[in-house]
């Protein structure tokens, strides 16, 4: 077999392959055997008809077509391996020549991983937020816990931020009621600022059974962007009542008997949470810095495929209802054009990151153990809410286990590279990235995941 490569662009190559008939005996034998099973010729057992009779019945062209179909995948794989082509995606293959008993020639065009220089991670410096398990952070965590066990009590004083109301809202333009912006019995927390612009300001200082009025620009619907008169009737007012931070609360909200024990545990929880956040920040900052120094083109077809996959996944959550997506975008205050643009940008970022990490993996050459792969599969199954055995069965059926192996390999390659980066926190303290990304730490994290 002979092959040659023509570089079409930084991200696409054309491979021309010639396969002599002398190398195609297994495929020829297989083609005749398959066709022989399809015909019953008097005087011969099924599957034992001579080749000249099969040629006469089906034509030599049918045999050659079967041979070509059988040989293409294997010979293509051999050619790109021999030429060192880092192919991504499916090739476009065209058989350009069939000379019976001489050779078969085909041409394959395929997207390839672009070549580029990796940055020197030793020269990268990043800054991440400092860990501050101070009293303020601890109190904030305890307040969050108190809020989970709070109760709502009726009151009749002037409303304040953080209190709750039940309201009826009526919107009108030039005296005409806007049905789509009108609702009754709506529960709302003052200060959440996620309903109507100006609502919080109007409610603060008001009392139960009062009606407040103001003007606001409608954010959604047929009258989006128009000024409307808003009338809000306050039918109920409530305030949050928090439990005392005492031993009784500790026993109610945790496994501890005293508030001192709960506070000590909260300190440890805050420190662990901030360490996890700091590790994630290091990873994100290093990856962003490294990608910023690596200049390479992206295969457009791969970007298009990624963008389509992202859109398909989102539509799947909406029962593949395109109109529902447009309604969702309108409720979020964005347009389909803006969404499509961001979807492509996200796809480009995802493809760029994967191509970068694939190249980094080849340089770092991390080893992935069976246990690491198993842990990652179990973690992924858990994130999808699937039974691990069922998930593994689906992976085997679809041939996706190799993809998860690559995910683990990319993560380990990046961890190895991060260990060479200079890291400081926002207070100027040096951080040893090996504390988070050393071999033992990475293995422990994956095991816990």
UniProtKB/Swiss-Prot annotation:
GO CC, one annotated term: cytoplasm
Listed Pfam families: FKBP_C, Trigger_C, Trigger_N
GO MF terms, alphabetically ordered: peptidyl-prolyl cis-trans isomerase activity; protein folding chaperone; ribosome binding
Predominant cellular place of this UniProt entry's protein: cytoplasm
Record region (Disordered): 428-449
Catalytic activity: [protein]-peptidylproline (omega=180) = [protein]-peptidylproline (omega=0)
Protein family according to the UniProt entry: Belongs to the FKBP-type PPIase family. Tig subfamily.
Domain commentary: Consists of 3 domains; the N-terminus binds the ribosome, the middle domain has PPIase activity, while the C-terminus has intrinsic chaperone activity on its own.
Protein name: Trigger factor
